[in-house]
């Protein structure tokens, strides 16, 4: 359990409860269901806290983690009840291809406490899906994983191939939603996600500022997020839960201003009306890495919980509320976020488009705002500017990658070309020039 006092507090506060199970829960729940409150059994159940006469007892028995390859959801009763009562429901079956978090370093997150990271074999995932389809005639699934990629692109590639095979066998097969980490995802993998019929994906976005993402130790970068968004939308994959967390302790004016400036590189995406940010508030509790800092600096009074406010301090004292409830937020925020929202709204409400026209070895770039030409540039097919755009179209590259890929050039010329393309808003470049990507699709050329 994420906080040792939490189970006892639940039982102390809610007298109608008999016991509390923590951790992953399957083994504990099964043992409790099989043996109930039999004498001599409770002390063998992992992560249980229970009432013992007038005292509350916690058991520290070591939990054994189940092998995911041996586990699938028994949906028989669920589907039989739907059929019996003729319920008009849109049916989706949950699939667990992995459990826990393979990263575990994000400073703001406390959602995976008590979980051990491991994966289910690709073969088991495929067989489970096929079994559900054949048994229940349900071809819509969704993945429960925190990150279906699971930090293993080779495994993910194999999984996508198997999902594509399922799609070829059952034409109406669809993956309604899944969550991925964008770092390292290639154009080819995103394309395969479309072929497998991923309808919607969440990417763990958190911030439009690369500096803030780095400071909170996210695995994603702004470049990896932007690259995935660019191609996912072009392949018809919707994006959900593009959440920005306000009031991160690492947040400052410069980070928010960086996020505002980065909206310029998202203008075509925002203008498509297929993408927008959801601005929310950071939540903290005693499970959060931030809690000790807030407590030691006497800042907790600035954070409040809608849930805990419903309970009188006669029932639970103020300090214990931070243990029980995980929705403590700070309602005030940096007003630069209002500017961010206004700028984003501008890009959403105005139509940005572009086109490339090729004539011999000259490519003309034209950019339009509400159908009015606002920028026109010419590139020679073999010059540095066009080479940079094409090389960084379907992959994120570094300046050293560009230097080795562009013939008869040098670092000074490439640096100048990068600077000019960035100023025009045609490429995004991080501060170390290790992540460069084209925000336009250079394959969209009119001849």
Pin down the residues of each PLM region.
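A structural motif corresponding to the C-terminal lobe/cap of the Radical SAM core domain
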Residues: 17, 119, 166-171, 181-353
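N-terminal [4Fe-4S]-dependent radical SAM core
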Residues: 51-95, 364-365, 370-378, 421, ...
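Long, charge-rich, low-complexity alpha-helical segments
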Residues: 379-447
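Generic structural signal for hydrophobic
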Residues: 10-11, 132, 193, 232, ...
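Radical SAM [4Fe-4S] cluster-binding motif and immediate context
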Residues: 69, 73-236, 246-249
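Glycine-rich beta-alpha loop elements in corrinoid/cobalamin-binding modules
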Residues: 1-63, 422
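Residue at a beta-strand N-cap/secondary-structure junction
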Residues: 4, 119, 395-396
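Hydrophobic, secondary-structure "cap" segments at the distal end of domains
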Residues: 323-397
């Amino acid at each position: 359990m994420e906080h040792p006092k939490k189970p006892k507090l639940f039982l102390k506060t809610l007298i109608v409860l008999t016991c509390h199970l923590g951790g992953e829960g399957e083994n504990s729940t099964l043992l409790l269901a099989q043996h109930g409150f039999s004498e001599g059994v409770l002390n063998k159940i992992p992560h249980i806290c229970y009432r013992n006469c007038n005292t509350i007892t916690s058991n520290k028995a070591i939990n054994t983690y189940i092998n995911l390859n041996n586990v699938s959801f028994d949906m028989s009763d669920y589907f039989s009840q739907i059929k019996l009562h003729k319920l008009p429901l849109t049916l989706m079956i949950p699939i667990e291809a992995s459990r826990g978090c393979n990263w575990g370093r994000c400073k703001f997150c406390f959602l995976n406490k008590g979980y051990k990271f491991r994966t289910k074999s690709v073969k088991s995932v495929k067989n489970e899906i096929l079994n559900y389809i054949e048994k229940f005639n349900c071809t819509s699934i969704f993945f429960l994983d925190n990150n279906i990629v699971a930090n293993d692109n080779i495994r993910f590639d194999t999984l996508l191939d198997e999902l594509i095979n399922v799609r070829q066998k059952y034409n109406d097969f669809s993956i309604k939603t899944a969550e991925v980490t964008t770092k390292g995802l290639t154009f080819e993998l995103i394309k395969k996600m479309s072929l497998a019929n991923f309808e919607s994906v969440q990417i763990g976005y958190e911030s439009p500022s690369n500096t803030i993402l780095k400071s909170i130790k996210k695995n994603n970068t702004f470049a990896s997020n932007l690259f995935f968004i660019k191609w996912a939308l072009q392949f018809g994959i919707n994006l959900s839960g593009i959440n920005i967390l306000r009031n991160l302790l690492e947040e400052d004016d410069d980070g928010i201003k960086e996020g505002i400036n980065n909206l310029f590189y998202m203008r075509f995406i925002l203008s498509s009306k297929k993408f927008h940010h959801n601005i929310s508030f950071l939540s903290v509790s005693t499970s959060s890495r931030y809690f000790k800092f807030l407590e030691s600096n006497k800042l907790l009074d600035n954070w409040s919980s809608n849930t805990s406010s419903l309970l009188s301090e006669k029932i639970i004292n103020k300090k214990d509320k931070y243990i029980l409830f995980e929705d403590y937020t700070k309602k005030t925020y940096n007003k630069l976020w209002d500017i961010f929202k206004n700028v984003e709204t501008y890009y959403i409400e105005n139509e940005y488009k572009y086109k490339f026209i090729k004539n011999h070895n000259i490519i003309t770039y034209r950019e339009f705002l509400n159908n009015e030409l606002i920028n026109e540039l010419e590139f020679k097919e073999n010059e540095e500017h066009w080479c940079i755009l094409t090389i960084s179209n379907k992959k994120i590259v570094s300046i050293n990658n560009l230097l080795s890929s562009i013939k008869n050039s040098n670092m000074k010329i490439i640096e100048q070309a990068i600077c000019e393309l960035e100023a025009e808003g045609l490429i995004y470049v991080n501060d170390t020039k290790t992540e460069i990507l084209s925000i336009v699709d250079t394959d969209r050329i009119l001849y």
